[in-house]
Amino acid sequence: MPAPCNCIESNVCICGTGCSGEGCRCGDACKCSGADCKCSGCKVVCKCSGSCACEAGCTGPSTCRCAPGCSCK
């Protein structure tokens, strides 16, 4: 039985607080929509309003930088 926080073995992307970075292996396919991703390897998704793209260096909501005139969500 795979470890509950091992995303590679369980095929489930764990983004909640139930997992710490310990023993958690998530790949690029694991995308979380909040700053609370506890798995190492999870990609926190940065979203800008409308069709605006996020600028380079955006690693999540706290570092989200959108094009001028766009808001981050």
UniProtKB/Swiss-Prot annotation:
Residue positions binding Cd(2+) 1: C15, C19, C32, C37
Residues annotated for Cd(2+) 4 binding in this entry: C46, C58, C64, C72
Positions bound to Cd(2+) 6: C54, C66, C70, C72
Molecular-function GO terms, alphabetical: metal ion binding
Induction of synthesis: By cadmium.
Residues at which Cd(2+) 3 binds: C26, C30, C32, C42
UniProt KW keywords: Cadmium, Metal-binding, Metal-thiolate cluster
InterPro entries named among the record's database cross-references: Metalthion_mollusc (IPR001008)
Residues that bind Cd(2+) 2: C19, C24, C39, C42
Sites where the protein binds Cd(2+) 5: C48, C52, C54, C58
Complexes and interactors: Monomer.
Assigned protein family: Belongs to the metallothionein superfamily. Type 2 family.
Function: The metallothioneins are involved in the cellular sequestration of toxic metal ions.
Protein name, entry field: Metallothionein 10-III
Organism whose genome encodes this protein: Mytilus edulis (Blue mussel)
